């Protein structure tokens, strides 16, 4: 076929109609790659040799450059290697690992196993085979265990594998008491250790475990690491240590007294501890903030809907144990925790009178006291702690209240209690008055979900209060009109479940308070109206409620990571839960 | 990561269970090829220059070798080009075409259009991009038409494109009157011209066109081609030329008279022609054998089921024209053609007596004569021509027959008639006696399909007679029990349609007479029991039949290449077809 023949064909065809076909052979790239691999194995047209250890791998520059930016950069731009026909990785790369990477480059396939996954992740990152690095990370995610999670955390941090880092970090937190005993723990960087011990999610009920762990880490390389001791100590919840442990630290541990900064930290922690022991006001220092696993779960309830007793949930023994009687039994009250104290507000007493009273139970000293009364007598209201203050939201009142309001109509009024000065203050009212709503605080804001409106309808709004603006806004609509629901917070996620709704009373949802997005999650194991929920550790707990004539008899637990509900224990037959709170836990002084 | 670290990981991991993950990124090869194309466009790592015309294309040897065996051999052998960094195609490939091939090599996509398809096919074959060659062939197949089919025939023959070659060949045969005027025809190689002109399927009704085409081809390059004249003359059916044309134009042609062998061929044809004109016996010479489009289609029928007239189907005018009366009207007879004569055997006359008579109609001289009577009087039998003899198969007889048989029971007897001796001879009987069967000959064998058995059932067998062995066998079973069906032969394929069957009376099947395999084909346009079929050219024709009280009014045509049926014309209202034959056609002498 000559050039002139083609020109003739062009001119001839142009007189006809335009007829075009796009031919695409989907398997062509795979065929080319397979042929290139065959050429490589026969050392044909190879123009560069990679060395690792004592092994040589002849390759094609063009193929390596097309597979990896590392090689593209190496062979271009006037670098020395761009002209050399050999590249020597020496002992920085194991020949078996390089072989696997090259097999992938020429075949798009690689076998990942327990022996090679970590090395492949490192080499894949180094040579910018990011697909291999990510595939190895995925393999390691699936094979994560308490015995290797700390090592994976270090590895993934070094190689920008964000998801593997998150998974291994979470596992390290959950199994802290195991990982602190591993060899890898002593090899952690300071920043990684800080990241671990600073988190509320670190699962230990005994803060001594954390305290001893950081001392161990510092002593492992005393000269290099003692300079980090002050910063590390600031992240230990020192005020949660038993008193004798703190005293021993002052007198016995020379390391702690040798540095002025460290001494100051210990002194501050000790003063904080003393304040707690003397019950001298509210202690809000970070030193006294318990980790999530250190929360105490308390149920308020009674043999009828009239609440007359506080019970404690014993996680270990899976039992519900009576702790104290309420001085003034009541129903339709609200309860919230601030620190290690439980505030019981309003409600209706034995003669159905609406109450302004606020009773306070101190879980450390196991004693009741009375706080200043609310400005408005309420029942069926909600309450939540926000920035160490108590907010009371909505509900009903009676004509006897100080402020004018219609009898039994849902209140708009919101009032705030500051334990520091034992005073109540009115704050901005809600857009819509509600009662029987779910009220929680998350990310420095209050959220109110649903409730009963002034028209006695179910409300489908999410109302939000920002204390810095002293203003309420409507952030979103609920998935359905709601009242008598329960809500609890994990991070930026608010979980809402059960309640009186047009849909099933077993349904549960998750609301992201930063994006205002709803997500449906797994249903509860039972239908629950008027149930109560708290968050502790990385889990949710729900108790109480009824459906029809059936009482719900179990305390259930929800694990967000597996999206599953499980039964923890049964509620005693004689107990009808009417409130559920989580307080800071302290070890016996 | 050092070698020792990897070794530690291996020894540690080995103590655990074997856990393997095969990672495959299916889009990886595409990605590598895309990167290689970018490198090519940036002239990075290119190590060879391809020249075509005045353009230069930098490429990677490894990639070209991976795409094409031509390049792999060129670059890897001891050839000069394996060392050179440049390859020059000069004017043997157009640069536009080479560019398209290289774009395909590096992207797996190419645009094929009318301007480039032929050149791409040639270059694809030359450079062993077989996928491109095949894709172009497919494109050209879809754009095949009478004006280009001869060119495509040459192109596909040169480049081993089997399917394109077959389609082009068929189109050349069907459009002979168009291609003979094409300049390309005169440039065909000798063996192809011989093959074309000698073909049975060459579609022309005027043999003079074939003669003139052959002479034109010789004259185009007389010096080199004169020696092929005898061979070309043998491809022309010279005895089918008009007598005057044969005597004056052909016999007097100077090129022929000067060459002894050619002269002898023409003299043989003249003797054959005279024999035909004088009606002196059967003419079986090859020079008198009409091409398939030279067949004449004859219907036998009448106003009732009693047949009294012969009709000619004029395919050009799409009319059915009366030609002659039958001397002795009859029904339930059988009709068959040998050469240009129609043989009518047996049947029942106006008084329902079963007949042994054999009437012969000469389509050339348009006259009737009587042949020797059959040995057995029959009706409802089948007949077919095999090696210039007439075979009569099965049917019913009466007690007055020469040989013993039960009244109205299907016959096993088969007899043969030799026109040259005007004698009937008994041959081997059927395995099972049948009447109302479809009987045809194909590939030197007789086939009888279905029919009514001696126990009055529909028979589901295919019975086959081998003349060499004088024996019947049962090589296959029909798709369903059948009788009153029609059958016709194209090559080694026997088409069977309609009839009395448990399934639809419009179903049609194809039977391969060499492999004995059945294939369903498109349904006939109407349900037809007792219909009749012939083959002519590359098509089937079916006529007659009824279903319930409905007569089928059309003459339909089936095209096997398209698997579709079309109506040719309407049968006159006064005509009930009872037989259908195809004879050799002769032009008016």
UniProtKB/Swiss-Prot annotation, chain A:
Kelch repeat spans: 296-340, 341-388, 389-444, 446-492, 493-538, 539-585
Record-level Gene Ontology MF annotations: ubiquitin-like ligase-substrate adaptor activity
BTB domain: residues covered: 46-114
GO annotation, biological process: negative regulation of fatty acid biosynthetic process; positive regulation of CD4-positive, CD25-positive, alpha-beta regulatory T cell differentiation; positive regulation of fatty acid oxidation; protein ubiquitination; regulation of translational initiation; ubiquitin-dependent protein catabolic process
UniProt domain BACK: residue ranges: 149-250
GO cellular component: Cul3-RING ubiquitin ligase complex
This protein's UniProt keywords: Kelch repeat, Repeat, Translation regulation, Ubl conjugation pathway
Subunit structure, interactors included: Component of the BCR(KLHL25) E3 ubiquitin ligase complex, at least composed of CUL3, KLHL25 and RBX1.
PANTHER family membership: KELCH PROTEIN (PTHR24412), KELCH-LIKE PROTEIN 25 (PTHR24412:SF487)
Translocase as UniProt keyword: no
SMART domains: BACK (SM00875), BTB (SM00225), Kelch (SM00612)
InterPro entries listed in its UniProt record: BACK, Beta-prop_ATRN-MKLN-like, BTB-kelch_protein, BTB/POZ_dom, Kelch-typ_b-propeller, Kelch_1, KLHL25_BTB_POZ_dom, SKP1/BTB/POZ_sf
Species of origin: Rattus norvegicus
Full protein name: Kelch-like protein 25
Pathway where this protein functions: Protein modification; protein ubiquitination
